[in-house]
Amino acid sequence: MNNEQPKIPQATAKRLPLYYRFLKNLHASGKQRVSSAELSEAVKVDSATIRRDFSYFGALGKKGYGYNVNYLLSFFRKTLDQDETTEVALFGVGNLGTAFLNYNFSKNNNTKIVMAFDVDPDKVGTKVGGVPVYHLDELEEKLGGITVAILTVPAQVAQPITDRLVQKGIKGILNFTPARLHVPEHIRVHHIDLAVELQSLVYFLKHYGNE
């Protein structure tokens, strides 16, 4: 995000892309203003939380009028650095990795996977979704200045790969493996364990489904 913006709570920062996506849809439909109640219904975040999130950035709307869609869209585009492209490297071209490469964040103009790594000789040297696949041994040579990585590799190799990424100056890792990665404090890791998320969903459906 833009370093000139005020520091905001992490929970708020995670919701900003959600707001931005909805505002893009509103803009595309020709809508010129939106209320916090409408935003709340669309993104499934309560109105009070939305107003508090927006308050960290000053007066973005007017009471009784709502929010100007074009203004908000422009503001959040700048806040989220949507005019700058962040290049990403993906590790592990299995089923999940292949899905990422074919999708390649097509709805997010500022994020793009530009290279992938694997050890399968049938995949190395090919392109998946237009993205070149290199051998893992080429990591140090090919990574260059990329600072964001996605891991979709077997759990047992996640930490060794992470250690190499740390040495290359990586700043952020989106980890889809069950492994809990150990990194220096200045490196950001988001763990996404799909099996755990699914188990959690099933549990809540069984025990809290009627609430």
Curated annotation (Swiss-Prot):
InterPro entries cross-referenced by the UniProt entry: CoA-bd, NAD(P)-bd_dom_sf, Rex_DNA-bd_C_dom, Tscrpt_rep_Rex, WH-like_DNA-bd_sf, WH_DNA-bd_sf
CC per GO annotation: cytoplasm
Residues the entry annotates as binding NAD(+): 92-97
Compartment annotation: Cytoplasm
DNA-binding region residue numbers: 18-57
Sorted UniProt keywords: Cytoplasm, DNA-binding, NAD, Repressor, Transcription, Transcription regulation
Record-level GO BP terms: negative regulation of DNA-templated transcription; response to redox state
The UniProt record lists the keyword Lipoprotein: no
Zinc in keyword set: no
Pfam families reported for this sequence: CoA_binding (PF02629), Put_DNA-bind_N (PF06971)
GO molecular function: DNA binding; DNA-binding transcription factor activity
Membership in a protein family: Belongs to the transcriptional regulatory Rex family.
Its job: Modulates transcription in response to changes in cellular NADH/NAD(+) redox state.
Subunit and partners: Homodimer.
Classification via HAMAP family: Rex
Protein name: Redox-sensing transcriptional repressor Rex
Origin species: Anoxybacillus flavithermus (strain DSM 21510 / WK1)
